[in-house]
Amino acid sequence: MTRNHPQPSRRTVLGSAAAAAFTLVTGTGTARATGPRAGWPEDFPLPDGWLPEGITIGARPYAYFGSRANGGVYRADLRTGEGRVLYEGAAGLASIGLKLDRDGLLYVAGGGGGTARVVDARTGGLVATHRLTAATGHFVNDVVLLGDRAWFTDSREAVLYGVPRGRRGTVRALPLTGDWEQLPDVNNANGVVGTPDGRGLIVVKSTPGELYRVDLRTGRATRIALSGAEDVVNGDGLLRLGRTLYVVQNRLNKVTVFELDPGVTKATLRRTITDPRFDVPTTAARFGDRLYLVNARFTSPQTPETTFSAVAVPL
């Protein structure tokens, strides 16, 4: 079920074809006009008690952070580190992974609520709410924009959800088959990105720490062989730049960087990024020559007084 809200979607005005083509051309769906300059902060605070997990950055120097506490969205200026709450959320909502498209629409994974929401990044207005699955027994975790759909992972069910990025179409549930074996009572599918050719998806399975290539026509998941690393356990957010894949391993406080082979059958470890400022980083986004990560601090008390931050490291 989809509920459309009063705020009009700019995608329905501009049409989905241009934005879909943009995503396929760039591979990451994000343009970079200028990069960070000297003096831009390398870390900055988020609101106390925000309980962040997801981050997304578009062509302009603004980062957007979802809240597990109330489903809100916070926008921070990368030039100053200052920000404001863009979307207030509401009691009982959660915002986990999120992605910003070219038209200024935020696609937001709703966690245990089983929904996906679309928020106008300019006004903070709620554009649409999509019911993906039941509100119990599921966890809608992360999202990637690919072609004319936003694809969401479900950590508790072997299925992906394709939400149409326009006025027409229905939500598509794509069961994962092939090499995929769903494990009970743990987080399975987590971070997701498109393949370099734009025809499929790469999904990280947090437990036991594996990467998969998914065929969007059939749902067949093929395990990607790792070279130089035994696993990517606690794999959370993914970022792909060309054939370079960044895997955020949250509780291990590191980002592992792999090179993908042309067929996306093998991932070779090239380096590991660590930083003393990491405090259970969950997801990452790029702006210029920096990688911005959000510290979810899962190992600390999650209270209204808990402090949170975002940090930047060189790519």
Residue ranges and their predicted role:
Residues 124-173:
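Hydrophobic alpha-helical segments and helix pairs
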Residues 290-315:
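Blade-level signature of beta-propeller repeat domains, shared across WD40, Kelch, NHL, RCC1
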Residues 47-63, 90-106, 133-151, 179-200, ...:
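Beta-rich, blade/repeat-based domains predominating
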Residues 40-45, 82-88, 127-132, 172-174, ...:
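A short beta-strand motif characteristic of beta-propeller blades
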Residues 77-81, 121-124, 165-167, 215-219, ...:
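Short loop/turn segments that connect beta-strands within beta-propeller blades
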Residues 1-8, 19-26, 32:
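N-terminal secretory signal peptides
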Residues 64-69, 106-113, 151-157, 195-196, ...:
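Conserved beta-strand positions in repeat-built beta-propeller and related beta-rich domains
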Residues 27-45, 54-56:
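C-terminal segment of N-terminal export signals and the immediately downstream linker at the start
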